[in-house]
């Protein structure tokens, strides 16, 4: 089960706080960064 930030839909990691990974349209909570 992936820890999604359900309130933060994204199209890429640039949409996520702290440059976190974007997976399946949602930001991952427990990812330090995503290149």
UniProtKB/Swiss-Prot annotation:
Its main location: secreted. It comes from the Eukaryota. It is found in: Secreted. Disulfide bonds join 10-22, 16-27, 21-34. One of its GO terms (molecular function) is toxin activity. GO terms for cellular component: extracellular region. Keywords: Disulfide bond, Knottin, Neurotoxin, Secreted, Toxin. Expressed by the venom duct. The presence of a 'disulfide through disulfide knot' structurally defines this protein as a knottin. The cysteine framework is VI/VII (C-C-CC-C-C). This is Conotoxin Cl6.16. It comes from Californiconus californicus (California cone).
């Amino acid at each position: 089960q992936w820890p999604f930030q359900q309130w933060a839909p994204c199209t890429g990691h640039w949409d996520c706080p702290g440059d976190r990974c974007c997976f399946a349209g949602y930001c991952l909570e427990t990812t330090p960064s995503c290149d």
